[in-house]
């Protein structure tokens, strides 16, 4: 019963973590590209 409650929370937390990390990596990548061009 507890698992059924925790599973969606775990999935949401993992998904949010991946999204935040992906956004940070994209920003870093864009920064590196602009630095290389400059």
From Swiss-Prot:
Compartments (UniProt record): Cellular thylakoid membrane
- Example GO biological process: photosynthesis
Chief location of this protein within or outside the cell: membrane
InterPro entries, per database record: PSII_PsbY
Highest taxon of source: Bacteria
Q: How does this protein lie in the membrane?
A: Single-pass membrane protein
- What family does this belong to? Belongs to the PsbY family.
The function of this protein is: Loosely associated component of the core of photosystem II (PSII), it is not always seen in crystals. PSII is a light-driven water plastoquinone oxidoreductase, using light energy to abstract electrons from H(2)O, generating a proton gradient subsequently used for ATP formation.
Q: What is the name attached to this protein's record?
A: Photosystem II reaction center protein Y
